[in-house]
Structures are given as structure tokens and as C-alpha cells.
From Swiss-Prot:
Glycans are attached at residues 54, 171. Residues 26-239 are extracellular. It is a multi-pass membrane protein. Its main location: membrane. InterPro entries: Neur_chan_lig-bd, Neur_chan_lig-bd_sf, Neur_channel, Neuro-gated_channel_TM_sf, Neuro_actylchol_rec, Neurotrans-gated_channel_TM, Neurotransmitter_ion_chnl_CS, Nicotinic_acetylcholine_rcpt. Residues 328-465 are cytoplasmic. Pfam families: Neur_chan_LBD, Neur_chan_memb. CDD domains: LGIC_TM_nAChR. Coiled coil: none annotated. This is Neuronal acetylcholine receptor subunit alpha-6. It comes from the Eukaryota.
Length: 494
């Protein structure tokens, strides 16, 4: 016989054994019940037969799409890649049971390939499988309601209009429907009116503005039956910050650098160099961003139009700069300034542009800059004079001091020309007078030439100023006109 101490030890061990293994037995009983239920439901079940009591009755399938990720939008190939969860809900009368008979089991998770499923496919699929794989399990309730939510990655066809790239909006649709069953056999009903976006991960390039669903009953040319489909329209907008910072703003800077060419003085000799440098920088920039812009020949994107506009802008600036430099370096020996050029570019336009001559000088023929009284010497040794230069008087006072001293008062009232012609003087004095006359004529010719050259330079400056304002206006209004198109286009569509 066991002692009281031994009986207590045996009783404690029995309690510990019951506490440890009782849940295990309950689990085994539960597993056996679930296995018995599964065997009862699928022992004579045929997954290829529609779950209807009458063959004329349709299977009502409730359908909903939940998007988790907008993976990619390929503008070139016109493909939208999405990560979706497709929720199917229908009733199968052959998969019902009484929970009281199976230890209160109300739900059962069964492999999807064991049950009948509606063959819902994506009609406008571009790449990959049209139908989702049945590797996931379905949730089966005791009243026969089945909920099947398989995940799928679809690459759907989407006609895209990139006219306003990178400020474009796209409208891509996903069309789901039964591939073999018509409306008389499967009636699709949409759950809600929009795509479920509770688990959506934001995309760094695209924003989903709206995602609405619609049900359509369509009769195709191939068949007499009516087929039901559910179409979800995704209205997406491109986020333009990346393209604005890396594409548009550099182009704007290049355009305004082109405007500065016309503010650069022509005498510095670097106007064409600056134009060529801007053109080369734009060319290199275009080569870098070629991979960024969608390559399509259907339409010209907005950013492509702007790059083309900038290229034409820079090219025209080179042409205008060459023309301005040609005007700037003209001389009286090569070109004669027409009267209309003087009127327009020396009088009219400077007043309009609020320009004035850098030096306050009198406009004339240049004769005021030459000492009067000096002309070409006659052939007989007499001097022809048009004035009374003071240095000639001093010369005659030096060499004919005796004669002029006695008649100083009389000569002061007589013309210098008469004095020179009726006075006798030495050959040295004639050489000095001829030299002074030659220097004066050269000064006069140089001043006249310099004045004409200054006129041409001023005309070039006026032309530069005109094109400076023209290019500023074209640059501002051209840029505004191009980038206001998306706003006006979207307003018109709305």
C-alpha cells in the first residue's frame, strides 16, 4: 500500500498530465471534426459544375478590386502595371453544413482549386496571364458563402496621350469579366462604386485622382448572348516635380542666357562665342535627357515642343548676332548708310527705346572739327582760304615783320586771303602752310570717317536693343503659352 506521501505525489502527477495533454486531445478532436467536415463536403463535389440548383439560374458573383500598388506606367509601350487584390463573393449551395453537428465550426479555409470558381479575366491584359492563379485559399462559411481574394499583378493595355508631358493626365481602365459564361450563367455585381484604396502604397511619380467602377452589359459580334463586365477607370496624374527641376528649369536658364547675348557689347568680340556655348550646352543637355522623355512618334510632348522652341531660339540668336556684328563693323569705304536707316535707327527707334548717344555732340558733317580757312593750295602758289586762322597771321608777322609793322592797323581790317595772295613769302613758309593744310584735311577726313563708323555702331546697338526686347517678349510669352496649355486643356476637358 502507498503511503499518504506517495498518494499525494501520484495525484499531483496525474493533474499535471491532464493539464498538459487535455488541450492536445481537444485539438485532435477538433482536427478530426474539421477533417470529417471537409470529407463530407468534397467527397462527392465536382468543381467543374456551376453551383446552381436549376440550370437556368445564374450564379451571382459580387466583385471588387482593391489596389495595393501602382507599380509602373510605361508610356512608350502603353502599359500600366498594377498590384491588385480581386475579391470574389458567391454562394455554393453544395457547400453548406450545420455548425452544431461539427462542434460549432462556422468557417473553413479550403484550397481554391477544390471548389468551383468564376473564370474572371482581365480583358485588356497586355503581358502575362489573363486569369489569376488559384493557389490561394478561399474562405468558406457554413451557409455556403465563399469569399476568394487572390492577389495578382496585371499589365494592362492603356492608350496614353503624352501631349502635355510632364503635366499629363492619363485615363487607364481595367476591364474584368467572365471569359466563357454569359449573363444568363454568371451575373456580375460590383461591390461599391470605387476601387478599394485602403492598403494603397503611394507612387513616387503618379497620383491616382479617381478610380471608379462601372458595370456594362455588352453584346459582341461573335455571339448572340449578352456578356457582363466590370470596368474600373483609373484617372492618374503625373507628379511633375522631377521633370521640372531636372528638365524645365535648366531649359529656362538656357533660354534667358540667350537673351543676354543681345546685351553684350559688340566690341568685346564674345557675342558669337556665347551663342555657340549656349547652343552646345543645350545640345549636350538634350543628349542627357533623351532617355527621360517618352520616345513616341504619335504626338510631340510638351517638353519636346519647349526644347525645340529653345533650340530655334538659340539658333536665331546666332543669326541675329552675326547680322549685328556685320552692321557694327561697317565703314564708309564698304557701305553707304541709306537715308531710311538714318531716319529709323538714328532718330525714331532710339526715342522709342529711350536710348541716347553716349556723348553729347552735335550731329553734322564733321566740318566743325576742322580749322576753317585751310584748303588746297592753288597751282600758281597762291593760297585759297575760307576763313582767317590765327596761326597764319602769326606766321606772316614773323617773316614780314617790317612791312606788317608799318601797316598793322590797315591789315587788321582786310581779309586774310587778300593778304596772303598779295604778299611775298619764302618757300619755307609755303611748305609749312601746305603741311598744316594736309594735316587739317586728314583730320577732317578721319573725323568724317569716324563719325560714319560711330553711326553704324549706333545702328548695331539699336538693332541689338530691339532684338533684346523682342527675344525677352518671345521667351516670356512663348514659355507661358507652352506651359499654360495643360491647364487650359484640363479645364476644357472638365
Amino acid at each position: 500500500m502507498l503511503t499518504s506521501k506517495g498518494q499525494g505525489f501520484l495525484h499531483g502527477g496525474l493533474c499535471l498530465w491532464l493539464c498538459v495533454f487535455t488541450p492536445f486531445f481537444k485539438g485532435c478532436v477538433g482536427c478530426a471534426t474539421e477533417e470529417r467536415l471537409f470529407h463530407k463536403l468534397f467527397s462527392h463535389y465536382n468543381q467543374f459544375i456551376r453551383p446552381v440548383e436549376n440550370v437556368s439560374d445564374p450564379v451571382t458573383v459580387h466583385f471588387e478590386v482593391a489596389i495595393t500598388q501602382l507599380a509602373n506606367v510605361d508610356e512608350v509601350n502603353q502599359i500600366m502595371e498594377t498590384n491588385l487584390w480581386l475579391r470574389h463573393i458567391w454562394n455554393d449551395y453544395k457547400l453548406r453544413w450545420d455548425p452544431m453537428e461539427y462542434d460549432g465550426i462556422e468557417t473553413l479555409r479550403v484550397p481554391a482549386d477544390k471548389i468551383w470558381k468564376p473564370d474572371i479575366v482581365l480583358y485588356n491584359n497586355a503581358v502575362g496571364d489573363f486569369q489569376v492563379e488559384g493557389k490561394t485559399k478561399a474562405l468558406l462559411k457554413y451557409n455556403g458563402m465563399i469569399t476568394w481574394t487572390p492577389p495578382a499583378i496585371f499589365k494592362s493595355s492603356c492608350p496614353m496621350d503624352i501631349t502635355f508631358f510632364p503635366f499629363d493626365h492619363q485615363n487607364c481602365s481595367l476591364k474584368f469579366g467572365s471569359w466563357t459564361y454569359d449573363k444568363a450563367e454568371i451575373d456580375l455585381l460590383i461591390i461599391g462604386s470605387k476601387v478599394d484604396m485602403n492598403d494603397f502604397w503611394e507612387n513616387s511619380e503618379w497620383e491616382i485622382i479617381d478610380a471608379s467602377g462601372y458595370k456594362h452589359d455588352i453584346k459582341y459580334n461573335c455571339c448572340e448572348e449578352i456578356y457582363t463586365d466590370i470596368t474600373y477607370s483609373f484617372y492618374i496624374r503625373r507628379l511633375p516635380m522631377f521633370y521640372t527641376i531636372n528638365l524645365i528649369i535648366p531649359c529656362l536658364f538656357i533660354s534667358f542666357l540667350t537673351v543676354l547675348v543681345f546685351y553684350l557689347p559688340s566690341d568685346c568680340g564674345e557675342k558669337v562665342t556665347l551663342c555657340i556655348s549656349v547652343l552646345l550646352s543645350l545640345t549636350v543637355f538634350l543628349l542627357v535627357i533623351t532617355e527621360t522623355i517618352p520616345s513616341t512618334s504619335l504626338v510631340v510632348p510638351l517638353v519636346g515642343e519647349y526644347l525645340l522652341f529653345t533650340m530655334i531660339f538659340v539658333t536665331l540668336s546666332i543669326v541675329v548676332t552675326v547680322f549685328v556684328l556685320n552692321i557694327h563693323y561697317r565703314t564708309p569705304t564698304t557701305h553707304t548708310m541709306p537715308r531710311w536707316v538714318k531716319t529709323v535707327f538714328l532718330k525714331l527707334l532710339p526715342q522709342v527705346l529711350l536710348m541716347r548717344w553716349p556723348l553729347d555732340k552735335t550731329r553734322g558733317t564733321g566740318s566743325d572739327a576742322v580749322p576753317r580757312g585751310l584748303a588746297r593750295r592753288p597751282a600758281k602758289g597762291k593760297l585759297a582760304s575760307h576763313g582767317e586762322p590765327r596761326h597764319l597771321k602769326e606766321c606772316f608777322h614773323c617773316h614780314k615783320s617790317n612791312e606788317l609793322a608799318t601797316s598793322k592797323r590797315r591789315l587788321s581790317h582786310q581779309p586774310l586771303q587778300w593778304v596772303v595772295e598779295n604778299s611775298e613769302h619764302s618757300p619755307e613758309v609755303e611748305d609749312v602752310i601746305n603741311s598744316v593744310q594736309f594735316i587739317a584735311e586728314n583730320m577732317k577726313s578721319h573725323n568724317e570717317t569716324k563719325e560714319v563708323e560711330d553711326d553704324w555702331k549706333y545702328v548695331a546697338m539699336v538693332v541689338d536693343r530691339v532684338f533684346l526686347w523682342v527675344f525677352i517678349i518671345v521667351c516670356v510669352f512663348g514659355t507661358a503659352g507652352l506651359f499654360l496649355q495643360p491647364l487650359l486643356g484640363n479645364t476644357g476637358k472638365s
